[in-house]
Amino acid sequence: RLEYRHTNEAKCEGVARELANVISEEIISLGMKETDFIGPVPCYTRKLYGRFRWQIILRGPNPVPLLQGLPLRGWIVEVDPPNLL
């Protein structure tokens, strides 16, 4: 799970959508046919401690090659999250 937080909701959503576009392109260019993603969508608890939260859920057997090429500065990366709430 990739999660982005920001005090401005439009900025948070925009950054999440930009990364989703990059992920889509990278999955195709790396030939990762078994990897897909859900999102970006707001987290279940959309706002926490004054910051809006958006997430992208990656699903696949080995997302490491994909993650290595992504611009993840400011993102929280959670491997095998115990829940998605």
Predicted regions and their residues:
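Accessory helical-bundle/CTD segments and flexible terminal tails appended to RecA-like ATPase motors
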Residues: 1-85
